[in-house]
Curated annotation (Swiss-Prot):
Entry EC number(s): 2.7.1.23
Gene inactivation effect: Insertion mutant shows a strong decrease in NADK activity compared to the wild-type. Under photoheterotrophic conditions, mutant shows a greatly reduced growth rate. Under photoautotrophic conditions, the growth curves of the wild-type parent and the mutant do not show any differences, and mutant shows a metabolic pattern similar to that of wild-type. Deficient mutant accumulates glycogen under photoheterotrophic conditions.
List of catalytic residues: 67
Family to which this protein belongs: Belongs to the NAD kinase family.
Name listed for the protein in its UniProt record: NAD kinase 1
Gene from which the chain derives: nadK1
Length: 307
């Protein structure tokens, strides 16, 4: 990878993340690389400016923060095919980030990138849009939204906690009509997030699939379902007379859903590309460490338990 132009996003409001971002910018500029840098957070979205200001192809996005900062980068940069190196600086769980200890010697990191001494993890993304009109000839309304974890169709109100009636169709066939708090349509990457909390299955991120999970359904027979990645999911919010239904992408508000509109969800045409610096990466070890599964309490040397 030749680093001619790099964007650096640091966690908004986190001093250590900003300090490391400035240090990385100086080092890359000393190597003749053009750098665009800015904060990323709830009130800060630097990516439209990054993409509009780039004078040439963006070779790398360096993200210094946690999983939330990484999700924002994936939503905006993956459709452009920009690889992401995400490092846990100020994050919490760090499911999607490289550990900070592999980023201590940053000069060595730049050398490794220039010498192509890294791996790339491809993570499936989802796309969603609003549609209205006839089922056989639907018209897209507004823009297309992307997510790395999940699309969530859920009502929101200032003064109460409304439930939803949601009808779901897959590839033109009715699946179920849920009365629930909301509905999740997730990727394998997102299966360890909101979907897992809603009693959905955990899927390996190396596979492509879509998980549909109702949130707190009133019927005990309403269960999560895993469908092929090429499936088209259509979601109709019903009986929303107070106009509360919203589409959320990775926990961020995307748009409101009006009566007569449906949400279409499908696999995005491009996957998120994450740079891996660790020489050994195990998804199962990540589950043990981050979710504190029982296996994390014991150390093994080969087949023998150490303690």
């Amino acid at each position: 990878m030749e680093l001619k132009q790099v964007i650096i996003a640091h966690k908004a409001g986190h001093n250590e993340s900003k300090t490391y971002a400035e240090r990385c910018a100086r080092e890359l500029e000393a190597r003749g690389c053009k750098v665009l840098m800015g904060p990323s957070g709830i009130k800060d979205n630097p990516y439209p400016v990054f993409l509009a200001s780039a004078t040439e192809k963006i070779d790398l996005a360096l993200v210094l923060g946690g999983d939330g900062t990484t999700l924002a980068a994936a939503r905006h940069l993956s459709p452009e095919g920009i690889p992401i190196l995400s490092v846990n600086v100020g994050g919490h769980l760090g499911f999607l980030t490289e550990p900070f200890d592999v980023f201590q010697d940053t000069q060595k990191v730049w050398d490794r990138l220039n010498q192509d001494r890294y791996a790339v993890s491809q993570r499936m993304m989802l796309a969603a849009s609003l549609f209205e009109g006839d089922r056989r000839d639907p018209q897209m309304v507004g823009e297309t939204y992307y997510c790395l974890n999940e699309m969530c169709i859920k009502p929101a109100s200032i003064d109460r906690m409304p439930t939803a009636i949601i009808e779901v169709e897959v590839d033109g066939e009715l699946i179920d009509q849920y009365q629930c708090d909301g509905l999740l349509v997730a990727t394998p990457t997102g299966s360890t997030c909101y979907t897992s909390s809603a009693n959905g299955p955990i899927l390996h991120p190396g596979m492509d699939a879509i998980v549909i999970t109702p949130i707190c359904p009133l019927s005990l027979s309403s269960r999560p379902i895993v469908i092929p990645p090429g499936s088209s999911v259509n979601i109709w919010p019903l009986g929303d007379f107070e106009l509360n239904t919203k589409l959320w992408t990775d926990g961020s508000l995307a748009t409101g859903v009006w009566p007569g509109q449906r949400v279409g969800v499908w696999m995005a045409h491009r996957a998120a590309q994450f740079i891996l610096l660790r020489e050994s990466y195990s998804f199962y070890k990540t589950l043990r460490d981050k979710l504190q599964w029982a296996g994390a309490r014991f150390l093994y040397d080969g087949n023998n338990k150490v303690n």
